[in-house]
Amino acid sequence: CQRQAVIEAVSKSVTKEAANGFCLITGDSDEVERLHPAIKGVWGAQTSGANIISFNLSAFNSWGKEQGANAPVGKHSAFAYTTALNSLLSKDSRQRLQIGDASTVFWADKPSPLEDQFADIFSDPPKDDPDRNARAIKALYEAPRQGVAPIKDNQTRFFVLGLGPNAARIAIRFWHVGTV
């Protein structure tokens, strides 16, 4: 809107340096992260890293807010999610799969054997144990016949996140939450 009265009203109600705000991740009041750390390891994204949350043009600003204030995430939460994703997306991670153009990561909210079995089912078998994938799938198929659950834990939450390249940003392709 270009009306002067609206511009003045918005300017008065918004501070340029909104140091604190409500974090969209935790819901708690926290110092808002202006620029989020880069996430590396997403196939097809820039090798120097890319962001899930970023605003690089003034056209993306809303209600007079700039950069991170448009999607407020606390400094602690921004550090936590980017550090966790960088770890999950690292080359040596067994919790990372490539599904089409989506770099897919998965984890449980507490230690669970499913984290290893999930990778065994969907990834290429290791050269030193080419039958590992077959054993993991066999265990899943034999469990109902034997009358036991392959993993006896329906309280542990399990997360699957698919990330895809989108110019200088990272797009969330899919997000699934279930139980082990």
Predicted regions and their residues:
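Short metal-coordination and nucleic-acid-contact micro-motifs, chiefly zinc-binding Cys/His arrays
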Residues: T15-G21
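Extended alpha-helical scaffolding segments
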Residues: C1-V10, D30-V180
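Short Cys/His-rich metal-coordination motifs, predominantly Zn2+-binding knuckles/fingers
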Residues: T26-D28
